[in-house]
Amino acid sequence: MKKTLLASSLAVGLGIVAGNAGHEAHASEADLNKASLAQMAQSNDQTLNQKPIEAGAYNYTFDYEGFTYHFESDGTHFAWNYHATGTNGADMSAQAPATNNVAPSAVQANQVQSQEVEAPQNAQTQQPQASTSNNSQVTATPTESKSSEGSSVNVNAHLKQIAQRESGGNIHAVNPTSGAAGKYQFLQSTWDSVAPAKYKGVSPANAPESVQDAAAVKLYNTGGAGHWVTA
């Protein structure tokens, strides 16, 4: 699953310089907060998609709690990915080429172009997956439901496509690796931020379809489709 982001201008102080200025090193040679970077990657923190982890060129690879993480930049483009240690495929990767040449202390205009996200291209290489893993299978309870007939919530066409890609429309789907659950594969922290009080702390997969639909609409209306890798 690949996610590409394009930025037309950079925020203050990013310090990105075109060319290969900077340094390259493995994580063992650098003072990196591995736990923090791993957590940001696992949760698809948008900070990683908006700017590099440091100025200049770098190339870091490290293992942490069963996963291998890679962060790199040539000073113009930056990217990151991670995958289960010992496997060849990356769970998630992101690239953000900077189109402007910027001095380290330069201040740019604060206009930022909307992120452009690649949709899955074909059935062979892009299967409906949970938000954070290409290598995980979504499982469901025996009472699964795969239609939206049980909901009266008005869900737009884009959200319906997201639901199909994330879970096949199954409201009881659960990703055993990431813990993402429900029709829209909510992470628990995201679900708790948009779910009604009655369902906070409850797995999204155990909530009625109408509640899941309403939460997804709320999340979509406030943050757009960027919450879903498959959007």
From Swiss-Prot:
Q: What Gene Ontology molecular-function terms does this entry list?
A: hydrolase activity, acting on glycosyl bonds
Q: Does the keyword Lipoprotein apply?
A: no
> CDD domains in the record, alphabetically?
RPF
UniProt biased composition (Low complexity): 119-137
Transmembrane region(s): none
Keywords of this entry: Glycosidase, Hydrolase, Secreted, Signal
A cellular component annotation (GO) from this entry? extracellular region
Q: Where is the composition biased (Polar residues)?
A: 106-116, 138-153
| Primary subcellular site in the record, as a coarse category | secreted
Instruction: Give the induction note.
Output: Highest expression during the exponential phase. Expression is increased about 3-fold by inactivation of isaA. Up-regulated by the presence of NaCl in a IsaA independent manner. Seems to be negatively regulated by SarA. Negatively regulated by the two-component systems LytSR and SaeRS whereas is positively regulated by sigma-B factor, agr and the two-component system YycFG.
Subcellular location per the Swiss-Prot or TrEMBL entry? Secreted
Query: What phenotype has been reported when the gene encoding this protein is knocked out?
Result: Cells grow slightly less well than wild-type in the presence of 2.5 M NaCl. Inactivation of both isaA and sceD genes results in a high degree of clumping and the double mutant is also attenuated for virulence.
The similarity comment for this entry is: Belongs to the transglycosylase family. SceD subfamily.
Name this protein carries in UniProt: Probable transglycosylase SceD
